[in-house]
Amino acid sequence: MTIEKLDGTSPRLYTLVAPLVMRRSVLRQNNNYPFWTSRSHTWFVAWEGETVFGFVPVEITDGGVAKINNYYVSGDDPRLLSRFLREIIQYYHRDYTIRSM
């Protein structure tokens, strides 16, 4: 499985996550709160073949914070969530304070 890092407005991001974020079942897991993105976001997307298994958008704030506001992991797989967190920590820990809301 690959975890790909994508800019928040990348056309590839939309191609990968649109089928998930438009599903009612995925939105329910996010308390019916829509997923959103911007140029301030970087998304970590786990995929293999034609299947996306999850994603974690990270927003960089003016205060030097890498903020995780929501995520989706298929089947609530704790191993995949841990892998996402390791990737995010490795990428941001030197330059940003990492916070999850």
Features from the language model and the residues they span:
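Conserved acetyl-CoA binding element of GNAT-fold acetyltransferases
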Residues: 64-76
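Conserved beta-strand in the GNAT
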Residues: 45, 50-59, 67
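Active-site rim helix/loop that mediates acceptor-substrate recognition in acyltransferases
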Residues: 24-47
